[in-house]
Amino acid sequence: MSDDEELEKIRRRQMEELQRQAMQRQMAEEEEKQREIEKARRQQILRQILDPSARERLNNVRLVRPDLADNVENQLIQLASMGRINRIIKESDIIDILSKLTENKREPKIERRSK
């Protein structure tokens, strides 16, 4: 095999690697774009069905329990998309929903025994 052929193989491999990396970057950018679109759609729905104090309450819950806030948001968005929410949700409604979701949950108690 001549030096020219080896050099051409190396160039071809490098070009393929660069193309593969560019493709991966493009796919990652597309996925990020889709996540942003979905996030904007969710925020728009929540702005339509929640009053400002309810949104603030949910954001405060998100600081402490992001999983609980996501759960409440998902339920509200699902109900709104099914047409089952026919009024603006107030802060007191959010408090009721949160209390119902957390009343049966018991936090595990960790005891540390020293010798």
Swiss-Prot record:
GO terms for cellular component: cytosol. It comes from the Archaea. The keyword DNA-binding applies. GO terms for molecular function: DNA binding. Residues 18-37 are annotated as: Disordered. Pfam families: dsDNA_bind. InterPro entries: DNA_bind_arc (IPR022889), PDCD5-like (IPR002836), PDCD5-like_sf (IPR036883). The keyword DNA-binding applies. Keywords: DNA-binding. Belongs to the PDCD5 family. This is DNA-binding protein TV0008. It comes from Thermoplasma volcanium (strain ATCC 51530 / DSM 4299 / JCM 9571 / NBRC 15438 / GSS1).
